[in-house]
Design a protein with these regions (language model features):
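Extracytoplasmic copper-binding redox domains, predominantly the cupredoxin/blue-copper superfamily
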Residues: 1-98
């Protein structure tokens, strides 16, 4: 879906869509991600350690997720949304909504 240095792009014909982001090896994948308005992003934790998803602008925030738990958020407005794992601050991601 994405290669190094390129954003993953959701299929624009499948609205509303759900796109999955994996939390694995202390990274979010794919990252960065570009989606159309109305897309739901579902983050799934595949690590043994807990992670969460916290946006810089506080528009979304998950609880701590154990392995195989997930969190979903539907992006209703265009913009760039940066997020982190609050317990692993070097774990960062970005969703661009077009």
């Amino acid at each position: 879906m994405a290669s190094a240095g390129r954003a993953a792009v959701a299929n624009l014909e499948d609205k509303p869509a759900t796109v999955t982001v994996k939390m694995v090896n202390f990274t979010y994948s794919p990252d960065p991600l570009t989606v159309p308005v109305g897309t739901t992003v579902r983050w799934i934790n595949y690590d043994d350690d807990q992670h969460n998803v916290v946006s810089d602008d506080k528009s979304f925030k998950s609880k701590l997720l154990d392995k195989n738990q997930d969190y979903s958020y539907t992006f209703a407005k265009k913009g760039t949304y940066r997020y982190i794992c609050s317990i692993h601050p070097k774990m960062v991601g970005k969703v661009t909504v077009e």
